């Protein structure tokens, strides 16, 4: 402010008399004051007025043509009073409280500039006995309106940029939270399967205990203790499952989203994933027909798994295409296609088996191999089916699900 305002003040003209200048210093000063949050406007006003005064005196001395320092000081004194008056009125009226109301802020800025110009003219009248007429006041008002328009234009552009940046940040946080909750949803599915398994093992152990009770007391006792330990594991898993379910249900996120928004969300997340892996992947999206809002976490956990697998399977460059259509009114079909290496025929029968993987890191460590098995499990649980079809280059995964499991009930 202390540098910009004096420099902007040199873009000037003299519409009223040889002493009263109109420059871009006033709108620039107004713009800076409107950005201040916690600093009282009086202090910046005093410092800016002093900086403008000193800068103008220096320029006059540098240019020469004056009879000593005193006339120069008189010539430039009125500018200091303009900025001081401007800052004091800005502080008294607490103009910054209207930061979110640009029209009101602009009106206050207009009034402040008119009053400050009148103070400057008054100082010049006291020093140089210049004449102040109603026509001059009218000219001042017109100039103040133009200054206010310029400042409010820049201010509105700045506020728009801030709003867009805030909206982008909020969207990124929302997408990140959706991804976290989607991953938690995936873990609850695995945990639910574990609960069923431990329940079955507990029952089988207890039945074995009852069969061995009359035959081998020592062995039956060990079996009973084992059944009890498994039962404790089951209860621990139940507590974890309940906590995860509560956490997912309590998140202030939408459970249902438009199909187009869901697929775009998958694409944005996997664009970042591909970039993190150092790969150049082009993503495409195609939606046929009309679709309801679908369950966010079900769709994300399925489609994002398949899309991430496609990204991982490709080399440096590739293409992934997401398609959505309705074969009929009761079914919806998602397709994930890539132009990667595809799936060889000899592993086609075991590709959905838990633990199977064809992906290894740079150290030769295999991945967990639970992604496709999870997708298969959740699709089966939703009464759907999943298939894959090798193309000339790449593979297409097709997931068909009943619409009733994806849309909001009622």
Swiss-Prot record:
Transmembrane portions of the chain: 16-36, 39-59, 72-92, 103-123, 140-160
Side of membrane Extracellular, spans: 1-15, 60-71, 124-139
Gene3D superfamilies documented for this protein: Histidine kinase-like ATPase, C-terminal domain
Membrane topology summary: Multi-pass membrane protein
SMART domains: HATPase_c
Boundaries of every Histidine kinase domain copy: 189-405
Function text: Member of the two-component regulatory system GlnK/GlnL that positively regulates the expression of the glsA-glnT operon in response to glutamine. It seems that autophosphorylated GlnK transfers a phosphoryl group to GlnL, which positively regulates the expression of the glsA-glnT operon. Interaction between GlnK-AmtB complex and TnrA protects TnrA from proteolytic degradation.
Stated name of the protein: Sensor histidine kinase GlnK
Species lineage: Bacteria, Bacillati, Bacillota, Bacilli, Bacillales
Gene: glnK
């Amino acid at each position: 402010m202390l540098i910009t305002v004096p420099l902007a003040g040199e873009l000037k003209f003299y519409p009223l008399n040889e002493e009263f200048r109109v420059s871009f210093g006033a709108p620039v000063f107004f713009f800076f004051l409107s950005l201040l949050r916690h600093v009282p406007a009086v202090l910046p006003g005093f410092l800016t007025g002093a900086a403008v005064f000193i800068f103008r005196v220096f320029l006059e001395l540098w240019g020469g043509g004056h009879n000593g320092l005193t006339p120069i000081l008189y010539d430039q004194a009125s500018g200091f009073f303009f900025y001081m008056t401007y800052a004091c009125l800005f502080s008294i009226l607490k103009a910054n409280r209207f930061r979110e109301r640009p029209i009101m802020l602009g009106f206050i800025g207009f009034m402040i500039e008119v009053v400050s110009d009148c103070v400057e003219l008054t100082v010049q009248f006291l020093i140089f006995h210049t004449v102040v007429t109603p026509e001059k006041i009218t000219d001042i008002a017109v100039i103040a309106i133009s200054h206010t328009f310029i400042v409010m234009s820049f201010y509105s552009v700045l506020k728009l940029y801030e709003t867009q940046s805030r909206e982008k940040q909020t969207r990124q946080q929302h997408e990140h939270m959706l991804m976290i909750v989607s991953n938690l949803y995936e873990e609850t599915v695995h945990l639910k399967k574990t609960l069923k398994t431990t329940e079955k093992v507990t029952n089988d152990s207890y039945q074995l205990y009852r069969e061995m009770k009359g035959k081998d007391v020592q062995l039956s006792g060990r079996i009973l203790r084992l059944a009890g330990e498994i039962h404790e594991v089951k209860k621990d898993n139940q507590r974890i499952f309940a906590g995860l379910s509560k956490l997912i249900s309590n998140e202030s996120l939408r459970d249902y989203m438009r199909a187009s928004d869901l697929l775009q969300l998958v694409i944005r997340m996997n664009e970042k994933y591909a970039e993190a892996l150092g790969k150049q992947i082009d993503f495409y999206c195609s939606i046929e027909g009309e679709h309801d809002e679908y369950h966010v976490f079900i769709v994300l956990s399925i489609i994002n798994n398949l899309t991430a697998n496609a990204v991982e399977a490709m080399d440096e460059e590739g293409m992934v295409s997401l398609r959505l259509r309705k074969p009929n009114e009761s079914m919806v079909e998602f397709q994930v296609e890539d132009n990667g290496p595809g799936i060889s025929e000899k592993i086609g029968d075991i590709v959905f088996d838990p633990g199977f993987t064809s992906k290894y890191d740079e150290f030769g460590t295999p991945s967990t191999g639970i992604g496709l098995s999870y997708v298969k499990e959740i699709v089966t649980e939703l009464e759907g089916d999943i298939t894959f079809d090798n193309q000339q280059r790449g593979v297409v995964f097709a997931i068909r699900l009943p619409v009733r499991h994806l849309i909001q009930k009622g």
